[in-house]
Amino acid sequence: EYYKTIVINFYNMVRKMDYANGGLGINEFFEDEGITTLGNYSEETCCSYNMLKLTDYMFRWNPDSSLIDYFENIFYNQIMCSMDPATGGKTYPISTAFGYYKIYSNAETAFCCCCCTGQESFSKLTYGEYYVTNDKSLTLMVNLFNPMTIKLNDQLTVKQTGDILLDGKSRITIVGNGKLTLNLRVPAWDKNPILKINGEKQTYQINNGYITIDREFSNGDYIDYEFNMSYRLDKQKGSENSYALFYGPFMLVCDLGNKDVDDIKDNQSDFGLPYD
């Protein structure tokens, strides 16, 4: 209990210093509470990787949907954007200042600790999506809304499909027959999602950030979960006029291309060069 208290206190302290996408630190240091300086050497990827692990432990202790709000943010907007889609190289920091670009690793001239945790991150893309308990009854907590199938037992399989980035919709289909409690997370970015069961719109109550569906399911039953993917601004901590723009859970960025940066793209010592 003593060490658990330390972990919770640490989490609550550093959350007061995170960037809009959940990343932490600049130059591998924490700043004063409530301050996040934008720069080229911010948000070390290893730090974000470990914050996901910490959040996972805390959620297992106390299943609170606000923990998954943070988990989702840092997963989509730091971890998922830390790999070069062309080469598989990983980022060390994620630059937060406008006009800076990412530098990716390679096996010959730029290889750091974040390459190793980065490999593990992309082997755990289902991490945090589902949590299963079977104390009093079989319960599946649906935390993230990415396509994924989970076999709960010999009688029941749950399949999630859809792409919320494209249309804000996710469908959960039941394969098999049996009793199941589904807890669907209500995300902070949409407190009023539309819920349909087998095509019929449902009313619901929200408890601890979740909608509970407790019933006997039949093979082929499906649940449609529809979100309002609206735009919103997130003010930078410690700044009066800097904001991040979000669309649903996704932080938006500007694609500035890579003109005139190819010559240093594999040199991780050149974090300080802005795109011009």
What are these regions (language model features)?
Residues 1-276:
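Glycan-recognition and catalytic cores of secretory/periplasmic carbohydrate-active enzymes
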